[in-house]
From Swiss-Prot:
UniProt GO MF annotations: metal ion binding; pectate lyase activity
Source species of the chain: Dickeya chrysanthemi (Pectobacterium chrysanthemi)
EC number: 4.2.2.2
Residues covered by region (2 X 6 AA approximate repeats): 177-218
Residues annotated to bind Ca(2+): 164, 207
Gene name of this polypeptide: pelE
UniProt entry tagged with the keyword Repeat: yes
Role played: Involved in maceration and soft-rotting of plant tissue.
Note on cofactor: Binds 1 Ca(2+) ion per subunit.
Cellular localisation: Secreted
Biological classification of the source: Bacteria, Pseudomonadati, Pseudomonadota, Gammaproteobacteria, Enterobacterales
Name of protein: Pectate lyase E
The protein's enzyme class: lyase
Amino acid sequence: MKNTRVRSIGTKSLLAAVVTAALMATSAYAAVETDAATTGWATQNGGTTGGAKAAKAVEVKNISDFKKALNGTDSSAKIIKVTGPIDISGGKAYTSFDDQKARSQISIPSNTTIIGVGSNGKFTNGSLVIKGVKNVILRNLYIETPVDVAPHYESGDGWNAEWDAAVIDNSTNVWVDHVTISDGSFTDDKYTTKDGEKYVQHDGALDIKKGSDYVTISYSRFELHDKTILIGHSDSNGSQDSGKLRVTFHNNVFDRVTERAPRVRFGSIHAYNNVYLGDVKHSVYPYLYSFGLGTSGSILSESNSFTLSNLKSIDGKNPECSIVKQFNSKVFSDKGSLVNGSTTTKLDTCGLTAYKPTLPYKYSAQTMTSSLATSINNNAGYGKL
């Protein structure tokens, strides 16, 4: 009798502990859902809170429910929790450029937080488009870069694709955190040839353009991609872009990406405590450069880690100079970064013009070490929140 009672008490205690743990986890995740940006440019201009003021969160696990939760252009506060993988095509293959344009571009309204639950927040076969809005948060998501079913041909440039995994277009106060963007199941070695040229079906991973401003990209992972992040889409768009396109990158990982991490026109970029992994001789994604300086673009790099195999001298410059590609700008400064484990001052010999901005936000760039680089690599991307 006593043993039975003891077992009963033990079972009840175990159940109580399980229930308590579940409630604590639910409570903790609810707190994450309402997080506001606390770092970088997204803290400015009134801050970035997404859907924090929503009365309750909505769970979705298919494209129909996702569109319903977004509710078109409705700008009331909303938190959308992605609990299962979402195929934006709805399982119906795109048949043409017009069909893909009509069905694959999902517009996100103002005052929205989209957050994945655990490792379930996955999007394939489409793009998340933040256009003409403000105050949007994307967290704990995996987005596979879309495959263009009808690339266009440009004389002298070959086949070119449309569609990016995510787009920030003429929007302000955007926070992208713990997001992974990757070519995933369709890597560039699967390209075919058409009319004797490579049939390119990927465009960018993330575009930030047309006067967008106050953006922070943190703890995210960009992997297995060629033209990764473009900030400022055209040399002729200075009237809209000048003084804007202010973006902070920190604690991100760029793993086997060929270029544009990022490439910037007109904007002011602050990149600290990021990790760059690549190989000039990689068979699919050969490393070209990390930072691209386009027209009137400027970059401040602090305490980043570059582990890059087979770097070579270009135009007689130090091999490390290939990290920064000068298009129509030379405004760049670095301090405290490591290149292949060693502190580098050699970027100062690359014909660059020092960039020393006065930043309006507080931040702490940790001293880069191999252990810190490992920690950043282990904690960036979706499923790590």
